[in-house]
From Swiss-Prot:
The gene is gltX1. It holds the Pfam family tRNA-synt_1c. Keywords: Aminoacyl-tRNA synthetase, ATP-binding, Cytoplasm, Ligase, Nucleotide-binding, Protein biosynthesis. GO terms for cellular component: cytosol. It catalyses: tRNA(Glu) + L-glutamate + ATP = L-glutamyl-tRNA(Glu) + AMP + diphosphate. Its EC number is 6.1.1.17. Catalyzes the attachment of glutamate to tRNA(Glu) in a two-step reaction: glutamate is first activated by ATP to form Glu-AMP and then transferred to the acceptor end of tRNA(Glu). This is Glutamate--tRNA ligase 1. Coiled coil: none annotated. SUPFAM superfamilies: An anticodon-binding domain of class I aminoacyl-tRNA synthetases (SSF48163), Nucleotidylyl transferase (SSF52374). One of its GO terms (biological process) is glutamyl-tRNA aminoacylation. It is found in: Cytoplasm.
Amino acid sequence: MSSDAASPVVTRIAPSPTGTMHIGTARTGLFNWLFARKHGGKFVLRIEDTDRERSTPEATQAILDGMAWLGLDYDGEAVSQFARADRHREVAEQMLAEGHAYKCFSTQDEIAAFRDAAKADGRSTLFLSPWREASDHPDAPYVIRLKAPRDGTTVIRDRVQSDVTIQNATLDDMILLRSDGTPTYMHAVVVDDHDMGVTHVVRGDDHLNNAARQIQIYAAMGWAEPVWSHIPLIHGDDGKKLSKRHGATGVMEYAEMGIPAAAMRNYLTRLGWSHGDEELFTDEQARDWFDLDGIGKSPSRLDMKKLANVTGWHIARTDDADLVAQIEGYLALTGAPALSQAQHDGLTRAMYCLKDRAKSLPDLLDKGRFVLENRPFDYDEKSVTMLDPVSRSILRELTAQLQNARWTRDTLEGVLNAAADSHGLKFGKLAGPLRAALSGRSVSPSVFDMMLVIGRDETLARLDEAASLT
């Protein structure tokens, strides 16, 4: 299969539920989701839960939560790999019956002794089972091994890495079924991908060598291979393997940081894929533009500054009401108190003046404190300094002058500039005390925006309160 649209596209995400959803898994899922959605295909979810000791319901839920937050909707029901163990055994038994696999009775001690001797002799430690061609079998525990080719080469035709040729002499007779009858991951993946109709396998390049081994199962069963695309991993900003010291590694950590999901999708899509020089784009553009040929061969680097810039671009272009809804979701996720109706309405009115230069949802909350907090204000230290006796006197005058003023930006600018002029001040000198009076803080949105958002009555009440400080 060489064409993106040779058959109805089916892609998958197949995480192991052994912890949080890693950002690398999220990006892989996003690439698969974009490709399927672009081609009108299916995107399916398989939970690879064969490691029963490490797989937990909580970790499975973490995967579902991460996908839901990122907006990666999948088709059909989630599939449990563990629940398909009978099917995996069935295929292994078929391969055994058809001569593509064999029973191996070698013990762990015998395998270890083989490798020790090979190492001592300077030979390859690749285990060569003496049972590969045996027909006389003892009554003893055994595993079922793939009968891998010993001669020639296997070519992985990869859309990202190009053709990769593997010498078959380097392939092991990998185990398909353990002695207790449970399937191995390497075997189960192939059976599941085939049965689920997966046409394109897009996964990390740490699985590239696995592909050469898994191709043998496809060949033995007479199944068509999927289109392979092995994508480079994500590194830290220093070029080393991504770890906690580089920043958050779990996708829900970004949700808890208040990164909007749309911004995260944009950033992750661009992390290892490109469409010309485009850095900032919408979901619709990503779906239209995404293709496998745009994925680079080199590892991408996590860059938190670039993520902040992407986030700022998306916040500035998001509908005000939608941003308030996202803030409510963020507060619920982090366990913070929910917005009251008054706070909800105030944020909605104020959002137009909060979005400028905001890099996260918490930034919006911080800028919006003037509509979230009630009087009396707990003035910050700088605000108290700004509200000196002279400033408080000017605020008292302004309170009287604003009583009957038309509540428009032009009128307010005229009144405040006239007040500054009458005291021989530039408006910037008056803006500080006004910010302090209207928000209780030294940093806030513009004075005029705050006055328009909170209205005449609340503005006058705040000016009066600040003017009355002693």
